[in-house]
Regions:
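Bacterial N-terminal signal peptides that target proteins for export
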Residues: 2-17
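Helix N-cap / loop-to-helix initiation motif
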Residues: 124, 194, 215, 464-467
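Active-site-proximal segment of zinc-dependent metalloprotease catalytic domains
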Residues: 178-186
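Peri-catalytic and regulatory segments of divalent metal-dependent proteins
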Residues: 30-169, 187-190, 207-242, 247, ...
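Extracytoplasmic and endomembrane cell-envelope/extracellular-matrix remodeling and assembly machinery
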Residues: 35-39, 50, 189, 195-452, ...
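Extracellular LysM carbohydrate-binding repeats and other cell-envelope/extracellular binding modules
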Residues: 467-496
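Short alpha-helical segments in extracytoplasmic peptidoglycan/chitin-binding modules
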Residues: 454-462, 468-472
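Bacterial N-terminal signal peptides
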Residues: 15-25
């Protein structure tokens, strides 16, 4: 979620940098066809990629270090060299991001990223190489600049205000945004590619796999795992499975791409390095990092900031580096922080000003003061007209210290803001003892014993619901699949 620092104003700079990268790539690849050699990374791309990299790492919780990160880096560089963007491994920078979202992407300049959560979903080294190769392929094929005019910035975890500002300025309909679900909290900063570009990246990625000696079928098996994870997430969160988050939302329809990837792979074989991969990722942090807060059912608890709240029934939460979002059919909200000068009234008006931008029609009501579980608090609501009717925008702020405040910002249909009242009233401080009881989850690779079954292994998963389904998806097992003695499988357990 959020760390104990104010949100940085660097996202606009970051997007400007990425836009510049796309334009430079366009100039270098304007005459490129799929049959010519790939233009190599230019010095200008490398310089601007380095600039964007700093801010991307901030947006995504930073890069992990240690043996697991080094392993991902090694695999990523090996596969990236196959693209022709650079002749040496040192031409590329590969980062394992501390994010609990299934995501991977690359930017011009040789910068490649994957999240620890996506790595945890994988089941062999070839799948890791396939995902990273797919992302490198987008850069090699210069897809970003070919989508420049229609590219969408998906800064999930970006301020709700950026969405509302666009809506209120007429860039989209807020009613439609509510109906589709505002995708926040998922730490995604990339360009949305067309289906044809995704298929081309799949194809190029499989070519890189084959050149590197990997099994090209790994692209299909990873896509199948992503499709299964998307479906499971929707089931657990009580949302429509068509509302896919993160990597799947910018990499359309992974399920339908499985068949195409399988057909392309044909009878070609190669290495998967399954046991090596599982050994290397053993102990990898999985799910929320307590330093960013943890979601447990309907409750969010942040041990470092010593706060907790409960989302309303029927809503699901998504956590990230700088915010936690609360999403449902009847509204969306986000908890974050902003600079605080000691006045809740001024704080709330500043939040509304950021939401509205230049739109003078968003006028909040008078700020109301209250106390929530002993915490000084204040709130205000503004009504806005959209093409699909009126909506209410509510800001509810809490003073945790003279120099520190947090706030919810929420949107609902007009007159329906009460749906979040229970959540607003649930905010509380937690004790040191409560904070110490928050334990991270991690991947635990185990060897199946002679008496083990899917059910017995799943019962060891550190979740109160969906243990069987989570175990099967995590290990790429279909409903009819069983486990065999000696086989290595992944569990998610509480860190010791």
């Amino acid at each position: 979620m959020i760390t104990n620092r104010s949100a940085q104003p660097g996202r606009a700079l970051l997007m400007s940098t990425i836009a510049s990268l796309a334009l430079m790539s366009c100039a270098s690849a304007s005459a490129q066809t799929r049959t010519t050699s790939t233009p190599q990374i230019t010095q200008a791309e490398a310089q601007q990629g380095a600039q964007a990299n700093v801010q991307i790492l901030q947006e995504f919780g930073g890069a992990l270090t240690g043996p697991q990160a080094s392993y991902v880096e090694s695999v990523g560089k090996n596969i990236a060299v196959q693209s022709g963007l650079g002749n040496a491994r040192d031409s590329f920078n590969v980062a394992l991001l501390n994010s609990s979202v299934n995501n991977a992407f690359a930017i011009p300049g040789g910068y490649i990223y994957t999240t620890r959560q996506l790595v945890g979903l994988m089941n062999n080294e070839a799948e890791l190489a396939g995902v990273l190769g797919h992302e490198v392929a987008h850069v090699a094929a210069r897809h970003s600049q070919r989508r420049q005019q229609t590219a969408q910035r998906n800064s999930i975890l970006g301020a709700l205000g950026s969405i509302l500002s666009g809506v209120l300025l007429g860039n989209s309909g807020l009613g439609r945004a509510i109906g589709q679900g505002i995708q926040q909290g998922s730490q995604l900063l990339t360009l949305k590619f067309s289906r044809s570009q995704e298929l081309e990246a799949d194809q190029l990625g499989q070519q890189y796999l084959t050149r590197a000696g990997y099994d090209p079928h790994a692209m299909a098996t990873l896509l199948a795992s992503l499709a299964a994870q998307n479906s499971l997430d929707a089931q657990l969160q009580g949302r429509n499975s068509g509302q896919v988050p993160a990597w799947a939302s910018t990499h359309p329809d992974p399920a339908s791409r499985v068949a195409a990837a399988t057909q392309r792979a044909g009878r070609t074989a190669g290495m998967t390095n399954r046991d090596t991969f599982l050994t290397r990722i053993d102990g990898l942090l999985y799910g929320d990092d307590p330093k960013q807060g943890v979601i447990e059912g309907q409750r969010f608890i942040h041990p470092d900031l010593q706060l907790a709240f409960t989302a309303p029934n029927g809503f699901y939460m998504v956590n990230g580096t700088s915010a936690v979002s609360i999403n449902g059919q009847n509204g969306q909200a986000q908890l974050t922080l902003a600079r605080y000068g000691g006045s809740l009234e001024n704080y709330i008006y500043d939040v509304f000003q950021k939401i509205a931008g230049q739109n003078a029609q968003l006028r909040p009501s008078a700020v109301q003061r209250t106390t929530v579980n002993g915490i000084p608090a204040a709130y205000a609501t503004a009504r806005a007209n959209t093409g699909n009717g009126q909506v209410d925008v509510t800001v509810f702020a809490y003073e945790f210290a003279r120099d520190r405040a947090y706030h919810f910002q929420a949107i609902t249909a007009a007159g329906r803001s009460g749906v979040f009242n229970s959540m607003f009233g649930s905010m509380r401080r937690i004790t040191t003892a409560e904070a110490q009881r928050v334990v991270p989850r991690q991947i635990d690779v185990v060897t199946v014993g002679p008496r083990d079954t899917v059910q017995s292994l799943a019962s060891r998963m550190a979740y109160s619901s969906g243990q069987m389904e989570r175990f099967r998806v995590l290990n790429g097992l279909r409903n009819s699949d069983s486990v065999a003695p000696g086989q290595k499988v992944k569990l998610v357990v509480y860190a010791r």
